[in-house]
A protein has these predicted regions:
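Helix-adjacent hinge/juxtasegments
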Residues: 99-107, 112-121
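Short glycine/proline- and aromatic-enriched beta-strand/turn motifs that initiate or cap beta-hairpins
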Residues: 20-78, 88, 214-230
């Protein structure tokens, strides 16, 4: 009888240890693979009582792949596409006069992100990234049906920059998280080459929310042993 009781206790203990081991493995445990999709859309319209109307739309798309090198520390690579278009109407009648602008930038780089868990659901995050960007921009002057490219305001640009961002992570499920950066401190150096000139223009920006659009909403999936089991 004692042997049966001892054997039963050993079995229960084994299952309890295994269950505890599974429970202690979280989304940010060492060895997990992280797939992140960042997406942002911003729209603006300024419409005073008179003719002038200004509208703009910006779309930001940034996927990344990372690896948890140790618990709560993620290292990875990212890739991003930013697109922006705007229309600045000066006169609507009798003949419309406006300026149309669009720009596309592609960026890629490396990043590291540290998690500071508050509980099983929430965590503070701090991330640092460094990367390169390249893109083009174009502006057209429109008068009625006549479109004239503005070569003085069109061209190509390349840059390098880095940032430290601060945010929050919400993990409703062990293998999925919603994350948002709420503040960032960055620096960016950019060289613009305008179509009507062989000279480049160097621009350096530094301050809050400069590099990589610190405000963002990320959808994050974690892949690792036992994360997707019920």
């Amino acid at each position: 009888m004692k042997k049966v009781i001892i054997l039963s206790l050993m079995i229960v203990s084994a299952f309890s240890v295994d269950a505890q081991r599974k429970r202690t493995r979280t989304a940010t445990s060492m060895g997990n693979v992280v797939v992140r999709l960042g997406l942002g859309v911003n729209s603006k319209k300024v419409d005073p009582d008179l003719d002038p109307v200004y509208t703009s739309t910006a779309v930001h798309f940034k996927p990344s792949v990372g690896y948890m090198v140790v618990d709560n520390l993620e290292l990875g690579v990212n890739f991003g596409v930013n697109y922006m278009t705007s229309e600045d109407v000066y006169v609507q009648s009798p003949t419309i006069s406006k300026t149309m602008y669009d720009a596309t930038d592609v960026n890629f780089g490396v990043y590291v992100q540290k998690y500071f868990p508050l509980n099983n659901w929430f965590a503070f995050t701090t991330s640092a990234d460094l990367g390169l960007s390249t893109g083009s921009f174009n502006e057209d002057d429109v008068l009625g049906s006549v479109v004239t490219p503005d070569r003085a305001r069109s061209g190509n640009r390349n840059g390098v920059g880095g940032a430290i961002n601060f945010g929050m992570a919400f993990t409703p499920y062990n293998a999925f998280s919603l994350q948002a950066n709420i503040a960032g401190l960055g620096v960016q150096n950019q060289k613009s080459d305008y179509d009507n000139s062989n000279d480049t223009v160097n621009t350096t920006d530094a301050g809050f929310n400069v590099w990589r659009q610190a405000y963002s909403l990320d959808f994050v999936w974690y892949f690792g042993r036992g994360l997707w089991k019920k």
